[in-house]
Design a protein with these regions (language model features):
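A conserved hydrophobic position in a structured secondary element of the catalytic/binding core
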Residues: 22, 58, 81-82, 105, ...
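Alpha-helix/helix-capping structural signal
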Residues: 25, 60, 85, 116-117, ...
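Cyclic nucleotide-binding regulatory domains
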Residues: 43-106
Length: 261
């Protein structure tokens, strides 16, 4: 249904899979309210306690993170959302203040609409309400899996999982991520991440340049990871088949290295 939406969703490779999954009549309910929105990395869409008034649909390689602030002033990521989903009032329906900070991890394009408009559309369409309820289930499952992963798996497994999840959602084999940022996302010291990245470089899995990680061997990277990302994928396929990004499909870019590399 990408052609019914504004330019951010209709441009090749810049789709949002959740919106493209809509039935034509449901897409028609949302289309008048969706507006293109661009953001640079590190922009905060919501702070803890903010009123949630807008739903954001990441498009293409745009990626956002849910962050929890810690007592020492640092932040730890609980989950990430890309073109497979949306953020802002999805679970609480916008009636409650934001608990986590929602930050743009990889900048790019969004489609945005008022929470009230989405709620009104869901009230008119049982199928639309059902779709977003199922997506909320997938989002919560991802958060639960992240909690278990942080408790049960080692730093290298979690680091590999994070990179794989970012590649899945962006469709890019070059991830704009510094080692310091990855350490912050995982809630660990940078020295741990530096040693892990050095081992991966030595083994030909990835290389580092200009604040980016370029993946050369996704299969080896997956072998270093835990199974948590696969568990999230499997749940998406069970609840919302076709939403979670595949290597290629008709509404998103193929898995590839970025241009100019």
């Amino acid at each position: 249904m990408g052609g019914m939406f504004p330019s951010a969703a209709s441009a090749p490779g810049a789709a949002n899979n959740l919106l493209n999954f809509l039935r034509a009549e449901d897409a028609a309910l949302l289309a008048p309210h969706l507006k293109p929105f661009s953001s640079k990395p590190n922009a905060v869409l919501y702070h803890h306690g903010d009123h949630v008034g807008t739903v954001y649909f990441p498009c293409g390689a745009t990626l956002v993170s849910f962050l929890i602030s810690m007592e020492d002033g640092g932040t730890v990521e609980t989950t990430m959302v890309g073109r497979e989903g949306a953020v802002g009032g999805i679970v609480s329906q916008g009636k409650l203040p934001a608990f986590s900070q929602i930050m743009v991890q990889f900048g790019g394009e969004f489609l945005a609409m008022p929470v009230e408009a989405l709620d009104a559309a869901k009230a008119k369409s049982r199928s639309l309400d059902n779709l977003f309820s199922r997506y909320a289930d997938c989002l919560m499952a991802q958060m639960f899996q992240s909690t278990a992963c942080n408790a049960a798996h080692g730093i290298e497994q979690r680091a590999a999982k994070w990179i794989i999840a970012a590649v899945d959602r962006t469709g890019e084999l070059e991830v704009p991520l510094t080692q310091e940022r990855l350490a912050s996302m995982l809630g660990v010291g940078r020295s741990y991440i530096s040693r892990i990245i050095q081992r991966m470089k030595r083994d030909g899995i990835l290389s580092v340049r200009r604040g980016k990680l370029k993946i050369h061997d996704p299969k080896q990277l997956a072998a270093r990871s835990c199974g948590c990302n696969d568990a999230v994928k499997a749940h998406f396929e069970l609840i919302l088949q076709g939403i979670y990004p595949a290597d290629t499909d008709g509404c998103q870019t193929p898995l590839r290295a970025s241009s100019g590399t």
